[in-house]
Structures are given as structure tokens and as C-alpha cells.
């Protein structure tokens, strides 16, 4: 089993795009200490959602210093936003060996989308990110972590190689469905160490059950 950890922003959230976004940003000093711990755990996989510019400015050099890699799930609708990853930033990440994934176009929930909106979020966004990053975009991360059976079928029809959620339980390496633990402003190196060192328990079982129910509803 592996543990997927998801970051959203490093440093200070200057402007919240959604209520509560700042809670998912981590102080840079804490981030560096977390990476020091993560580097000791080869079973950990890292990813970054939302495509904030801190991915390239702060996260990339810290990852490189520790020989770590991560997948960066960017937003196609923010490629011209100075606070977000632009095409040059995506190409920089890719040239450093970091895979680029899709987080959609507008950071909206993907459940219950019309066919028109789904085409933009699942197909057009992927194409735009592939062009912007000059390479393939094979994986997707669900905005806000919401999904149901219909969305799972849509994503499979789009032939994504893997889909990442915000469900909190360990995942199987190579599985199409990848659950993740989101890192928040409350986390520290010590909390990350505790997460990675403990055995799967009741919380993980609850997460697995909730995920199974969402996939059949």
C-alpha cells in the first residue's frame, strides 16, 4: 500500500478564491520540514492541486533538493492568472521530471455536470494543459473531492490513467482510483510522521466505505 499526500499551496494565501482555501495552505518553513520527513518514507506519493504559483516558486526547488517528485494538477482556466501556474511554469515542472495532471477548467465540482460543462472540464481542459505543458496529461484530480458513479463512468470514458480523490485512506500502487490525504495549515512534521507511521485503522475503514458508497450512488 502507498500513502498519497496532497498539498494545495505553500506560503501565505494572499487571496481566497473559495471560502476556507487558506486552511489548505502550509507555511513554507513547515512545508520544508514535512518534506524532510516524507523523504524518509518511500511509500509516499505527493501531489499538488489548484495550480498555485507556489508550486513552481517554492515546492519545486524543495522537492529537487530532496530528490522527490510530485504530480501537479493544474487548472486550464487559470493559465493566464499571475497567481497560478502559467504555461512556462508547467513546462519548467515537466522538464524537472514532474508529471502534469488535470484539475479541470474552473475548479467546480464535477458531479452532476451537463454534457457541455463536462466536455470543457474533462476534455478541453486536458487538451489545453497538454498543449501548455508540452506533454501528455494522463491523470486527473477531482476538484473539491466530489464524485459519484456517473462521474466515475465519465472519467473512464475519457481514458484517464488514474483519478485522485480527497478520500482519506491508503491506496494501492497502480490502482485507477487513488485516495489521498490533504495536508492542511494545522499539519506539522510531527503530524505527518504520525500519519505515515500508524497502521490503518477505523478512520481509514470509514473512508474506504464512504468511497465505495459514492461510487455506486
Located regions from the model:
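Acidic (Asp/Glu)-rich catalytic clusters
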Residues: 36-39, 60-68, 85-101, 156
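A short alpha/beta connector and helix-capping loop motif
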Residues: 54-77
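Charged helix-capping and loop-helix junction motifs
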Residues: 83-91, 115-122
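Histidine-centered catalytic micro-motifs
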Residues: 5, 9-10, 99-107
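C-terminal active-site subregion of NodB/CE4 polysaccharide deacetylases
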Residues: 1-47, 52-56, 112-139, 145-217
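Short beta-strand and adjacent tight-turn residues that come in two discontinuous sequence segments
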Residues: 73, 103, 163-165
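Short, small-residue-enriched loops and turns at beta-alpha junctions
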Residues: 78-81, 108-112
Amino acid at each position: 500500500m502507498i500513502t498519497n499526500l496532497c498539498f494545495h499551496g505553500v506560503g501565505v494565501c494572499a487571496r481566497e478564491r473559495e471560502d476556507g482555501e487558506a486552511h489548505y495552505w502550509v507555511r513554507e518553513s513547515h512545508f520544508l520540514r514535512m518534506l524532510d520527513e516524507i523523504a524518509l518514507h518511500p511509500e509516499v506519493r505527493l501531489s499538488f492541486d489548484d495550480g498555485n504559483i507556489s508550486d513552481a516558486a517554492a515546492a519545486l526547488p524543495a522537492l529537487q533538493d530532496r530528490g522527490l517528485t510530485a504530480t501537479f494538477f493544474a487548472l486550464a482556466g487559470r493559465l493566464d492568472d499571475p497567481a497560478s501556474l502559467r504555461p512556462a511554469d508547467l513546462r519548467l515542472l515537466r522538464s524537472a521530471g514532474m508529471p502534469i495532471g488535470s484539475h479541470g477548467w474552473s475548479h467546480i465540482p464535477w458531479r452532476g455536470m451537463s454534457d457541455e460543462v463536462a466536455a470543457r472540464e474533462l476534455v478541453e481542459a486536458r487538451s489545453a494543459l497538454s498543449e501548455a505543458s508540452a506533454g501528455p496529461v494522463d491523470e486527473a484530480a477531482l476538484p473539491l473531492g466530489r464524485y459519484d458513479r456517473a462521474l466515475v463512468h465519465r472519467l473512464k470514458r475519457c481514458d484517464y490513467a488514474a483519478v485522485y480523490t480527497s478520500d482519506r485512506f491508503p491506496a494501492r500502487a497502480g490502482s485507477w482510483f487513488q485516495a489521498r490525504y490533504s495536508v492542511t495549515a494545522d499539519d506539522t512534521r510531527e503530524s505527518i510522521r504520525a500519519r505515515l507511521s500508524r497502521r490503518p485503522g477505523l478512520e481509514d475503514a470509514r473512508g474506504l466505505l464512504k468511497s465505495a458508497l459514492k461510487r455506486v450512488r
